[in-house]
Structure formats: structure tokens, C-alpha cells
């Protein structure tokens, strides 16, 4: 479904820089630029693509659109109150940096916060993520990436409402949705994937990238790094003719 009525952006206050000024390195306004710089060096957010958002109680901090990720600073960060977003056609910001635009990823980040109570959501344009979606195009099941019996799977939780992490022998499943011309139009399909696969912490976007979330910045970052590792392993396995799903029996 194409976006026909763009969301109206409103700023409540003209002087709200106090929301992004902090000496604490763990403050969201400091963490987001640091994360984006790290992701840029990994090749995940090339050419201003991708983004990150952190929720701290009711405040949501968002990376802007169009800023080189390795050059991002705290003053570039948008801030909104998640409880003030009552009209889907209007997004109210507590802080909007001058001469910048909000990220088109914003409604997808908000879906992770409202539907999964996430503390952080990351969007990358990782080449490995894109390659996985391309490999799946010619597979019998094109809408699900599945892999098991790889140690790094242990980095993922069992599900939003479950305790503990997946084990070595468990199968990690990441749904795939089709890309759309406009990023915000992905929102309804991301939400559908969340509803259909409630245990997932990520959604792949065909020929585009991946969205990954977690209950904290640490968890989201850990899962994003682990997922990229697994995507790369899976691409190399495909080259060698090795299956992503294998029947490895547990050692007694």
C-alpha cells in the first residue's frame, strides 16, 4: 500500500536541547551517533542508509534522515514522547533538529517499541542480509530464513514473552517481507510479520536490509551483530553446498 497522505511532523517546543545534552556516554543522544559510526565502519549503513532508535521510558530518540552516519552528532537527534502519539497522521516531536528531516524508518522503529516493548531498534543495509533475501528468492520457502546447529544462535532470545535464549540445536527463524518504494510503507508488513511470528527479534526486507530489535541497546546490538555473522556464514555455506538446516544429534 503506497503512502498517499504523508505524516505531518509537529514540534511541541522550540527550546528542547536539554533532551540531548548529557555527559553520560550511555545517554541515548550519545549512544546513537556512536552506534551509527560503528555500523558505518562495518558497512551496514553506507550512504546515509539505515538507522537506529532508542527508547528510554516514554522518550524515543531517533537518528535523522540524510546525515552521514559516521559524522552524526547528538545535536542531530530527534526526540518524541511515545505517549503523545495519538494521531497516526501526525507525529509530535519534543525536539526536531533544524534543517533536517526525520528518518523514514521512524514508524517501523515505533512498531518495535509499541508492539514488542523494545528498548532499541536497529535498521541496517547489510550486504549479507540483502544476499540472504536474494538466495531465498529461488528457494521453495522465500519468506523465511532458517538456520540451526550454529553456536551464534545462542545470542537470540526464545521470544518476546519467553525467558531464556535459544540453544545450539534450536532453529533460528527470521521472516522476510517484500520491499516497497517508500520505507514507511513497510510498516504494515513489518507489523504483520510481528503478529505472525511473535518469537522473532528481526525482520528481513527483500533486496533492502534488516530490522533488529531488543529489550535493551545491548541486546539489540548483540542480536544484530550475531545475525549478520549468521547471514555471512549462511552465504558461504550456500557456496559450499552445505544446508542451513542439519540434523546434528545432541551429544549424550
Swiss-Prot record:
InterPro entries on file: Aldolase_II/adducin_N (IPR001303), Aldolase_II/adducin_N_sf (IPR036409), MethylthioRu-1-P_deHdtase_MtnB (IPR017714), Salvage_MtnB_euk (IPR027514)
Residues spanning the membrane: none
Binding site residues for Zn(2+): 123, 125, 208
Location, primary (coarse class): cytoplasm
Subcellular localization(s) per the UniProt record: Cytoplasm
Stretch forming the signal peptide: none
Protein name as catalogued: Methylthioribulose-1-phosphate dehydratase
Taxon lineage: Eukaryota, Fungi, Dikarya, Ascomycota, Pezizomycotina
Amino acid at each position: 500500500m503506497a503512502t498517499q497522505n504523508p505524516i505531518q511532523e509537529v514540534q511541541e517546543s522550540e527550546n528542547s536541547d536539554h533532551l540531548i545534552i548529557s555527559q553520560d556516554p550511555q545517554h541515548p543522544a550519545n549512544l546513537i551517533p556512536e552506534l551509527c559510526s560503528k555500523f558505518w565502519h562495518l558497512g551496514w549503513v553506507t550512504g546515509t542508509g539505515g538507522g537506529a532508535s532508542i527508547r528510554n521510558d516514554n522518550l524515543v530518540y531517533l537518528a535523522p534522515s540524510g546525515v552521514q552516519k559516521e559524522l552524526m552528532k547528538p545535536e542531530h537527534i530527534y526526540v518524541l514522547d511515545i505517549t503523545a502519539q495519538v494521531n497516526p497522521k501526525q507525529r509530535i516531536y519534543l525536539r526536531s533538529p533544524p534543517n533536517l528531516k526525520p528518518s523514514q524508518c521512524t514508524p517501523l522503529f515505533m512498531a518495535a517499541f509499541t508492539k514488542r516493548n523494545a528498548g532499541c531498534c536497529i535498521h541496517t543495509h547489510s550486504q549479507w542480509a540483502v544476499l540472504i533475501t536474494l538466495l531465498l528468492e529461488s528457494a521453495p520457502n522465500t519468506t523465511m530464513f532458517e538456520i540451526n546447529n550454529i553456536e551464534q544462535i545462542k545470542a537470540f532470545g526464545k521470544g518476546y514473552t519467553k525467558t531464556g535464549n535459544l540453544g545450539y540445536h534450536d532453529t533460528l527463524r527470521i521472516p522476510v517481507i517484500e520491499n516497497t518504494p517508500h520505507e514507511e510503507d513497510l510498516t504494515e508488513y513489518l507489523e504483520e510479520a510481528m503478529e505472525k511470528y511473535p518469537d522473532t527479534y528481526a525482520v528481513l526486507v527483500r533486496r533492502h536490509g534488516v530490522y533488529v530489535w531488543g529489550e535493551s541497546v545491548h541486546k539489540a546490538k548483540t542480536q544484530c551483530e550475531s545475525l549478520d555473522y549468521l547471514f555471512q556464514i549462511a552465504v558461504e555455506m550456500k557456496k559450499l553446498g552445505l544446508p542451513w538446516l542439519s540434523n546434528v544429534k545432541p551429544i549424550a
